[in-house]
Amino acid sequence: MTIREVIELVDRLKPNQYGSADKLRGLSELDGVVWHEIWSAHETAVPAFAGYGLETDLDGTALLIGWPYDEIYRWYLEMKIDDANGEMTKYNNSAAKYNTYYQAYQNAYNRAHMPKGEAAYFRL
């Protein structure tokens, strides 16, 4: 899923007053967390993630998490919108759905990729 697809999906399903730059910042934040907490903790060689900026190609940039877990982006942006609007009941609902997708993705990634090896003992 591309950045523009997520932004258009959220705008269609949850009309809001926030611009693309705010949503881009949220998507960059989420992918940064995914890269740091999940991807970089495994042996798979992944390029460093520098975030998305205003110069990022919204149509040509695919987000880090693919199908079937890509709904995480929708729920993350909806959660951020609900928080900014002070709608705590809606925020809690969006947060629960976001957390479900995040945990499912993390579990699937952990099953499919070997974690970085750590020393089992120290030689003195």
Regions found by a protein language model. Give the residues of each.
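Short amphipathic alpha-helical leader/targeting segments
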Residues: 44, 91-92
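Generic alpha-helical propensity signal that fires on short helical segments
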Residues: 87, 95-99, 116
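Short secondary-structure subsegments characteristic of cysteine-rich extracellular domains
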Residues: 92-106
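Short helix-capping/linker segments at secondary-structure and domain boundaries
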Residues: 80-91
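Elongated alpha-helical scaffolds
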Residues: 67-80
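Conserved short "hinge" loops at termini or chain/domain junctions
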Residues: 1-62, 103-124
